[in-house]
């Protein structure tokens, strides 16, 4: 397949060559020379699906008719506009999510990447991820996405049980999933991630562990475990509400998660985030930006972003949400160059709350250096060092606070939500009192 432009062809070839030379061995790769405010990840939302899954409440639509050329033009325009408004000079990763972006034309993916390459620097080892569903991504189509510049796939496998797949409203079978996974690994060796869900109605620990063991015979170097969340407004929620299905058992889900983590550790996977496991250094660079509270631009209907617009003097980060409905979003992009519906300036405390809640999702946690990038006056020791409730969490081995920073233990990662019930109020209280003290041993 031909790409729409020689620059995109050259960039895709360079990316593939760099990918052969080396793998990303740590989160974020080599330090970038640009200041943090000039760097960002880019998320591109494709809002369309073949059908709505029974558990999903994401911003997605079943198109009655689709003029992809118009959608492509608007995605390109909004990407260019947001890059200009943000002053971002280096894009460190691109993630095509949805919806089902594997339903988009590879030409659309190539056009977006070409536009971004014209507006910002793209490193040769740029991670470009595409979410794919097995039924919308036969091998020939995956190869075309590779030619367009995609070098990493995230496959929504969800289950290897056909009964569970039907319950979830998925359009693929377990055989479809494994066939697509095998083809993806052939085309993108070492760069394929799969999702596996747990905590479904009537799901039992033993059969689910059997699925995980089976998946280990087929998967690549990245795997995500996600617990089902029953969302109001979904078909699955309604079935549980009216008693047609049993409510998921949270204790069984917790056991699945704990035993699943142990199985993956024995298989050589490193848990680098609450839901994510990797081996051979195959971490998700794009998602790492989220967990480290880096800047990211959200392009497409309903996309979310976090960046400092140039008009704000480059000092106030904003949370941004694009217009949800695709037709309205396209009208706004054609009129204004972007479809931003909501802008919320983030105060310093709000930003620190995000740094805390997101950073503790990772095994690295929050280093002192990283914290000081967001709050140079109030240290982690100031906030958490003398609090009795936090000390109890440290003594129970759920948290660690030392010369490296603040992080969860292996046991603590599994109960992070409960830890944040203590940590976030303590941060808020310390912020109100703000009386920095010397660092122990400093």
UniProtKB/Swiss-Prot annotation:
Gene Ontology terms: biological process: porphyrin-containing compound biosynthetic process
Domain Radical SAM core as annotated: residue spans: 34-270
Xref: SMART domains: Elp3
Location of this chain's protein in the cell: Mitochondrion
Pfam families named among the record's database cross-references: HemN_C, Radical_SAM
Keyword 4Fe-4S: yes
InterPro entries: Aldolase_TIM, Coproporphyrinogen-III_oxidase, Elp3/MiaA/NifB-like_rSAM, HemN_C, HemW-like, rSAM
Binding site for S-adenosyl-L-methionine 1: 43, 98, 131
Taxonomic superkingdom: Eukaryota
Residues annotated to bind [4Fe-4S] cluster: 49, 53, 56
Key words, A-Z: 4Fe-4S, Chaperone, Heme, Iron, Iron-sulfur, Metal-binding, Mitochondrion, S-adenosyl-L-methionine, Transit peptide
Role summary: May be a heme chaperone, appears to bind heme. Homologous bacterial proteins do not have oxygen-independent coproporphyrinogen-III oxidase activity. Binds 1 [4Fe-4S] cluster. The cluster is coordinated with 3 cysteines and an exchangeable S-adenosyl-L-methionine.
Protein family: Belongs to the anaerobic coproporphyrinogen-III oxidase family. HemW subfamily.
Misc. comment: Might carry two S-adenosyl-L-methionine binding sites with only one binding to the iron-sulfur cluster.
Designated name of the protein: Radical S-adenosyl methionine domain-containing protein 1, mitochondrial
Gene behind the chain: RSAD1
């Amino acid at each position: 397949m031909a790409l729409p432009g020689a620059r995109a062809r050259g960039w895709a070839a360079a990316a593939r060559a760099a990918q052969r030379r080396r793998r990303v061995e740590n989160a974020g790769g080599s330090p970038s020379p640009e200041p943090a405010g000039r760097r960002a990840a880019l998320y591109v939302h494709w809002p369309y699906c073949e059908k709505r899954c029974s558990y999903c409440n994401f911003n997605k639509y079943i198109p009655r008719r689709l003029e992809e050329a118009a959608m492509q033009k608007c995605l390109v325009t909004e990407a260019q506009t947001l890059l200009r408004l943000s002053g971002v000079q280096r894009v460190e990763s691109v993630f095509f999510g949805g919806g089902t972006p594997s339903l988009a034309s590879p030409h659309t993916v190539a056009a977006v990447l070409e536009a971004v390459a014209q507006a910002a620097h793209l490193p040769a080892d740029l991670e470009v991820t595409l979410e794919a569903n097995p039924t919308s991504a036969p091998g020939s189509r995956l190869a075309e996405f590779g030619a367009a510049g995609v070098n990493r796939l995230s496959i929504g496998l969800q289950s290897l049980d056909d009964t569970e797949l039907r319950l979830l409203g998925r359009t693929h079978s377990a055989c479809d999933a494994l066939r697509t996974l095998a083809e993806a690994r052939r085309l993108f060796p070492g760069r394929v991630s799969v999702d596996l869900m747990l905590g479904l109605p009537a799901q039992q620990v033993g059969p689910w562990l059997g699925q995980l063991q089976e998946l280990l015979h087929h998967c690549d170097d990245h795997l995500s475990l996600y617990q089902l969340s029953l969302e109001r407004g979904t078909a699955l929620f309604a079935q549980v509400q009216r008693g047609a299905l049993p409510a998921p058992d949270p204790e069984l889900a917790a056991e699945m998660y704990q035993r699943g983590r142990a199985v993956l550790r024995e298989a050589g996977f490193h848990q680098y985030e609450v839901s994510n496991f990797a081996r051979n250094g195959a971490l998700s660079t794009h998602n790492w930006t989220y967990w480290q509270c880096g800047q990211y631009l959200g392009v497409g209907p309903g996309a979310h972003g976090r960046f400092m617009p140039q008009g704000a003097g480059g000092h106030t980060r904003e949370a941004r949400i694009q217009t949800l409905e695709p037709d309205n979003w396209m009208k706004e992009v054609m009129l204004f160059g972007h479809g931003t519906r909501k802008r919320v300036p983030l105060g310093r405390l709000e930003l620190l709350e995000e740094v805390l809640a997101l950073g503790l999702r990772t095994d690295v946690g929050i280093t002192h250096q990283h914290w000081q990038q967001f709050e140079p006056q109030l240290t982690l020791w100031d906030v958490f060092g003398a609090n009795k409730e936090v000390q109890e969490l440290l003594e129970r081995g759920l948290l660690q606070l030392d010369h490296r920073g603040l992080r969860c233990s292996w046991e603590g990662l599994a109960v992070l939500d409960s830890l944040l019930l203590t940590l976030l109020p303590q941060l808020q209280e310390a912020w109100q009192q703000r009386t920095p003290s010397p660092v122990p041993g400093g």
